[in-house]
Amino acid sequence: MSETTKDDGSSQKKSVRKEKRAYVLRKWTQFDVGRASTVGTVHLLCLLAPFNYKWEAFRFGIILAILTNLCITFSYHRNLTHRSFKLPKWLEYPFAYSALLALQGDPLDWVSIHRFHHQFTDSDRDPHSPIEGFWFSHVLWIFDTDYIREKCGRRNNVMDLKQQWFYRFLKKTLVLHILAFWTLIYLWGGLPYLTWTVGFGGVIGYHGTWLVNSACHICGSQAWQTNDTSRNVWWLALLTMGESWHNNHHAFETSARHGLEWYQLDITWYLIWFFQALGLATNVKLPTDAQKRKMAIRR
């Protein structure tokens, strides 16, 4: 096993990939079955959406998908995972709760997995590297809890969040919040709203996030020496709210801004900048010129 050092001084362990185990013919935990059922239900509702079309339902689904998935990138990713900026708790918690409605899990689980990804990028301990195949990195890893635990170990990398009652509460009551959300949507607008909001909107959010894990480690360009497969994929920037400038992100993990060039669309950064201008987002981290010179690929 070898070790490389990133620009922020953190180490990243590399090792030889383990032989990939059988996927279908294995023990499925209750959590695996539950998550697969949720993802399957969302995709089924998406398939039903065209047969339940209403303009107002379609419009609401698009708006809610944008808002909840922006909360994933703003809250779960840049605020909670990387501490790229700081918010007052009265603002941090509502954003985290809104991200919960994007159906990508509770904050403790999401943040832990992503921190492991950066700690073990493209090694046999990376929870979702495309070295085990596109579809594994895109979605299949989600349904194999035991394998992820075997690769990464105990999820003791989120103690900063576990110390807060709010995040422990969300983890324990995740299913109740999701069921309540789905029920309210159905009671408000019936099947059209359910299919376009939970189904269509959920699928957009799922695959936007998943493409960062898969496509952004396979295709695209590299501007920085990150010693991994991370890529900048311009055509995913809008769908991912700026997350697809993934090589930028792996080079400067704690940066609140992923689209480092003026022409690199980064909607999440624009929101962070807005709150910074209001004095609500503080300790906003950006790479220095010295860090950029150190990490730049010499052409």
UniProtKB/Swiss-Prot annotation:
Q: Which UniProt keywords apply?
A: Endoplasmic reticulum, Fatty acid biosynthesis, Fatty acid metabolism, Iron, Lipid biosynthesis, Lipid metabolism, Membrane, Oxidoreductase, Transmembrane, Transmembrane helix
Q: Which GO terms describe its molecular function?
A: oxidoreductase activity, acting on paired donors, with oxidation of a pair of donors resulting in the reduction of molecular oxygen to two molecules of water
- Kindly list any coiled-coil regions of this protein: none
* Entry's transmembrane regions: 55-75, 174-194, 262-282
Which segment of this protein is annotated as the motif Histidine box-1? Answer: 77-82
GO aspect biological process, one term: unsaturated fatty acid biosynthetic process
Q: Which InterPro entries match?
A: Acyl-CoA_DS, FA_desaturase_dom
Query: Which cofactors?
Result: Fe cation
Pfam families xref list: FA_desaturase
Q: Where is this motif: Histidine box-3?
A: 246-250
Asked whether the keyword Transmembrane is assigned, the reply is: yes
Uppermost EC category: oxidoreductase
Segments carrying motif Histidine box-2: 114-118
**Location of this chain's protein in the cell:** Endoplasmic reticulum membrane
**Part of which pathway?**
Lipid metabolism; polyunsaturated fatty acid biosynthesis
**Assigned GO CC terms:** endoplasmic reticulum membrane
What family does this chain come from, according to its entry? Belongs to the fatty acid desaturase type 1 family.
Q: What does its UniProt record remark on the domains? A: The histidine box domains may contain the active site and/or be involved in metal ion binding.
Q: What is this protein called?
A: Delta-9 desaturase-like 2 protein
